[in-house]
A protein has these predicted regions:
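A conserved active-site cap/scaffold subdomain adjacent to cofactor or substrate pockets
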Residues: 1-24, 28
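Short, solvent-exposed amphipathic alpha-helical segments in soluble enzyme
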Residues: 6, 64-67, 153
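Hydrophobic faces of well-ordered beta-strands that scaffold small-molecule active sites
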Residues: 7-12, 41-47, 133-137
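Glycine-rich, proline-tolerant flexible connector loops at the mouths of alpha/beta enzymes
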Residues: 13-15, 136-149
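An alpha-helical appendage that flanks or caps ligand/catalytic pockets
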Residues: 18-129, 164-174
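Short glycine/threonine-rich loop-to-helix capping motif typified by GTGT followed
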Residues: 54-56, 145-155
Length: 174
């Protein structure tokens, strides 16, 4: 319905890839209904991303006990389970709610690592969900200002040029 009204899609950072992937066909359907071209360049996909110069720092900041990503997803998972919506995080809808753990959610929803690894993960995301126009960096509270700032710089200056080279674009916003 949103596409038929002229709106462009944004897929949320807390969604499993299987849900993100389901957005494109619905967008196409809405566009076709009103004779509007469906352009993947208009699709924005948000992801929780953390980039660091070294893998150990990236892993600790993304997954560790004091991680802002852990805090964010802990809050979200707790609320979803409380209100009977844990299925949002289930790769298989037959899983029990107890099988939906915070560690599993972090593994499924957070892209982290060195610039090269994050580039590979973003390209794998595109392979999984399909072509999209813009990656939206879903920011979290910075538990460490320098690491948070450096993550954004590394993403812009190191990771995205690798991604853009691989997909054949030079658009800085992607």
């Amino acid at each position: 319905e949103a596409a038929a009204r002229g709106w462009d899609p944004i897929s949320a950072n807390f969604l499993l890839n299987k849900w993100v992937k389901s957005h494109w066909p619905k967008y196409v359907e809405g566009c076709e209904r009103v004779g509007r071209p469906a352009d993947p360049a208009n699709w924005r996909v948000a992801k929780s991303v953390f980039v660091s110069d070294d893998m150990a720092t990236a892993k600790e900041y993304a997954l560790g006990a004091q991680s802002p990503y852990r805090y964010y997803y802990s809050q979200l998972l707790t609320k979803m389970k409380k209100h009977g919506r844990a299925n949002l995080f289930k790769a298989d809808q037959n899983m029990s709610d107890d099988e939906v753990t915070l560690d599993r959610v972090l593994e499924d929803c957070v892209i982290f690592g060195t610039p090269d690894k994050v580039a590979d993960d973003i390209l794998a995301l595109r392979d999984n969900v399909g072509d999209f126009g813009t990656l939206l960096y879903a920011g979290k509270d910075w538990a460490d200002v320098e690491l948070g700032r450096n993550s954004m710089i590394l993403l812009a200056e190191k990771t995205m040029p690798l991604v853009n080279a691989a997909i054949g674009t030079t658009k800085a916003s992607q």
